[in-house]
């Protein structure tokens, strides 16, 4: 018996190379493990989630996500003022989250808001730029309500002006996008915002540029 052996067709072997990392253009002095990089252009912005891989070097782990900053853009360094419709430039710690709905997965404190929760924006008040609860009882003349839908369905406090310097701006949050520039906050569509909140670990900072 004679066996006739066929020749197998050559199989192309493709080398699988890992995608080259995309580095974040951040302040080289950063040492925190995670940075939310928000790059503004007019009232629009692009957010990238950056993780440290070595001292001063960060790679993009998530994003880009499109959203908005202040309706009047990003303020020049140190130039942010109360009511100017601008988002403050610079780097700030991310603080606790809050919202109408339950914590979606943020690994930090979460406040389920009620109609009584407000953030004081009266620069003459001793409680300027802090979370308080109604009634005001003369303690402030104006405040941002924290139970607003859809903007504050999910939100997180950006640790801006924590020294509470009068007139330098208050109530700067990361919150749900409404399709237009904000009063000074950073906003993202709900799906993108939830991705950010679930990615974050305690100790993350935000870096806002233009």
Model-derived features: positions:
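Secretory targeting and sorting signals
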Residues: 1-19
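Cell wall/extracellular polymer interaction/catalysis modules
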Residues: 19-182, 193, 198-201
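Long, compositionally biased interface segments
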Residues: 188-210
């Amino acid at each position: 018996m004679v066996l006739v052996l066929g020749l197998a067709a050559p199989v192309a072997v493709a080398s699988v190379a890992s995608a080259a990392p995309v580095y974040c253009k951040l302040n080289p002095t950063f040492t925190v493990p995670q940075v939310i990089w928000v790059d503004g252009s007019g009232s629009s912005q692009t957010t990238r989630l950056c993780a440290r891989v070595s001292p001063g070097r960060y790679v993009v782990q998530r994003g880009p996500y499109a959203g908005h900053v202040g309706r009047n853009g990003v303020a020049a360094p140190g130039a942010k003022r109360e009511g100017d419709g601008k988002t403050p430039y610079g780097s700030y710690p991310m603080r606790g989250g809050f919202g109408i709905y339950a914590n979606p997965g943020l690994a930090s404190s979460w406040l389920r808001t009620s109609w009584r929760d407000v953030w004081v924006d009266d620069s003459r008040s001793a409680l300027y730029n802090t979370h308080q609860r109604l009634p005001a009882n003369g303690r402030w003349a104006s405040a941002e309500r924290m139970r607003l839908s859809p903007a504050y369905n999910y939100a997180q406090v950006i640790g801006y002006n924590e020294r509470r310097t009068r007139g330098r701006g208050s109530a700067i949050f990361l919150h749900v996008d409404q399709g237009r520039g904000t009063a000074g906050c950073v906003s993202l569509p709900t799906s993108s915002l939830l991705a950010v909140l679930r990615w974050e670990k305690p100790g993350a900072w935000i870096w806002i540029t233009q």
